[in-house]
Swiss-Prot record:
One of its GO terms (biological process) is glucose mediated signaling pathway. One of its GO terms (cellular component) is nucleus. Residues 48-92, 109-134 have a biased composition (Low complexity). It comes from Mesocricetus auratus. This is Homeobox protein Nkx-6.1. It is found in: Nucleus. Signal peptide: none annotated. Residues 306-364 are annotated as: Involved in DNA-binding. Residues 101-268 are annotated as: Repressor domain. The lineage of its organism: Eukaryota, Metazoa, Chordata, Craniata, Vertebrata.
Amino acid sequence: MLAVGAMEGPRQSAFLLSSPPLAALHSMAEMKTPLYPATYPPLPTGPPSSSSSSSSSSPSPPLGAHNPGGLKPPAAGGLSSLSSPPQQLSAATPHGINDILSRPSMPVASGAALPSASPSGSSSSSSSSASATSASAAAAAAAAAAAAAASSPAGLLAGLPRFSSLSPPPPPPGLYFSPSAAAVAAVGRYPKPLAELPGRAPIFWPGVMQSPPWRDARLACTPHQGSILLDKDGKRKHTRPTFSGQQIFALEKTFEQTKYLAGPERARLAYSLGMTESQVKVWFQNRRTKWRKKHAAEMATAKKKQDSETERLKGTSENEEEDDDYNKPLDPNSDDEKITQLLKKHKSSSGGLLLHASEAEGSS
């Protein structure tokens, strides 16, 4: 039994060092300093006669590795010290290989208790149980190493790219969306003010060019203005842009003064209102169309009203002329044709009178 335990120790240490994850975990555990003492409940030990079998199943420290925490390695003949490793390694960190393998929650204790429970076990059964115990301990150590790597911040951030000192720093957030930068760009593009344009008086009302609250370069590319959507057929669907009340008020005030804008005027108005030049251009086109329709309707109404007034005045003048001719006294010596025409116009009203007059003339 002692020979088997002595042979299993180097085999287990060689198995631990042969796998890269366990070797890396073991070296990391050696580099750590003890932060707090590990307190574990002592492992249940069997009778004194089975101490050799339990010691053969317990792992031994790997060859050629120094003991972390300044602990002395156990002596070769001290088998009683191998039966209780948690008491001697109480000052070490709880993340070492020996601490992980000697925890009571691992299947090491159950595997170690099997040969100790049968006092009449043979050497072959103890060696097979020891090899199974070492395999299960290696699997448990690999799982613990993976869990520790996943729980540590370094393991979570290991896959992220790192920026070296040679890479340029990121630009400041106000470089691209800055009203001052947009103002400098606009002044550089259109250096002349609107009042200095040849042949044009200043057309903007005073509140536009004095930094109104809606004058912001970030408002020129808002998603709700001129955004493009897709309908059910997958075709591009242009939505109608929406403007604020202040923008519409400024556009209306400018349209009252001029119906057409030059290129620099349109650019400055678009910048002052936080709009694009195309939006201002389209708005003025639509506004001119609306104004033409309204003006044409007003002109048609005025013409119709004027025509009706002219007809009324013409009818009134004709009636006045007829009344003047009718009110003139009849001359007996005048032409009979004129008298006949006047009588024909008023024959309905004076039919009986004409009959009596003709009879009187015939009798005479």
